[in-house]
Amino acid sequence: MQIHAADHVLPITSDPIGHGAVAVDGSTVAAVGTLDELRLRYPDSPVVDHGAAAILPGFVNCHSHLEITSMRGALDDVEHDFRSWLLKLNGLRAELSDEDICAAAVAGAAEGAAAGVTCFGDIGRMGHAGLAALKQVGLRGIVFQETEFSPDNRTADDDFLKLATKYEQLKLKETDLVRVGLSPHSPYTVGSRLFELIAQYAILNRVPLTIHAAESADETELLAKGTGLFKGFYDKFELEWNSPHCTPIEYLERLGVLSTRPLLAHCVRVSVSDLSKIKANGAKIAHCPKSNAKFGHGYAPFEQMLDAGVIVGLGSDSVASNNVCDLLEESRFAALTARNRDGSERFITAQEILETATLGGAKALGLDTEIGSLEPGKQADLTVISLSNIAQGPISDVHTALVFASNSRDVAMTMVAGKEIYRSAAEA
């Protein structure tokens, strides 16, 4: 048993605790309260006092691509054209060896740990790279084996067999901390027949799914009209595209994919009707505001998602499109852009965005019975954020100090399942 104390403890599911503490017993949280209370309850337990800091649940980055960490900045010259960005990404990826990709994934995982992330929802063409990286760094997460470019219904059965084989091989490597799922990339890169096969398999075998959906205007145009930049993918490979004449969310519902309760990444171009369908099917959303903005895709209606009762978590996306994995920075950007939307009557609070970055992400990945809040019996996944920087004080409200005056460089310590996986030089 060890007690971690700080000026502020944020359980997330209850009010902040001043002069608070968290008792950690093995891999779990034993108790949360004031330091005085926990000292009385556990008089023989050592105390680690982090001082001017906040202890909160570890951040859950529910949408990332760790295996392309080495492409940070390499695609910035084409990000004004999403189709060109995707083509260049695949070209550069083809030049990397397996060793390169595995090393990139480890670097990305370590960056996340140093930023207070304790859990990832990571997507990879080489799923084993992300899985090995999370294991090596000591992180928790779900690694989603991604499809290749597979829009041709004529090859759907073969494409599915290859994907299922990769998934089943990956599943043999699951641990208590790292689990696996599937990621049919998007409505514009995966054929309808393959989507149906994956959905049937996921329901039968209880496989978690994540999908890029309604990310860009190009995607919505392709599905609604059968035209636009993404039609070029089909023309390039001499493939036929029969437009379903609907939104991406309606399309996924028609194919039975929404009934698998997938985690939908981005959802920039969604209507009130789309959100209603997402909620009704129990699907979730990974909100990636910085990546969306960097591409110029638009503002995802974050506040409308919350008002609709949809489960929402935060994602950094890859550092090839965002450049950093910093959930504090992502939180700040999410709050500011939501507040600044024209016609928005919803004022997102710092408390709401911290809940989204922790418990929201845990719910989005289906892990909220284990992580996402500091409660007795839950896993001891936590981060300690220093509040001693001159630019952070005075601390009038700990939520606003964290969201609007802190970033990943203020992370002092990160713990997963009771094991410290990162400690800053200042904290050492």
Spans of model-derived segments:
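Active-site gating loops and adjacent loop-to-helix segments of metal-dependent hydrolytic enzymes
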Residues: S70-A103, V137, I142-D152, S216-R261, ...
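Active-site beta-loop-alpha junctions enriched in small/polar residues
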Residues: H65, R125-M126, E146-S150, S183-P187, ...
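C-terminal cap of metal-dependent C-N hydrolases
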Residues: Q379-A428
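Histidine/acidic residue-rich metal-binding segments in metalloenzymes
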Residues: D44-P46, A132, F160-K284, G296-V312, ...
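N-terminal metal-binding scaffold of metallo-dependent hydrolase/deaminase domains
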Residues: M1-R41, A53-I55, K419
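His/Asp/Glu-enriched, well-ordered alpha-helical/loop segment
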Residues: L255-V257, A300-N389, A405-S406
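Alpha-helical scaffold segments that flank or form the walls of functional sites
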Residues: A54-I55, G73-G138, F160-T175
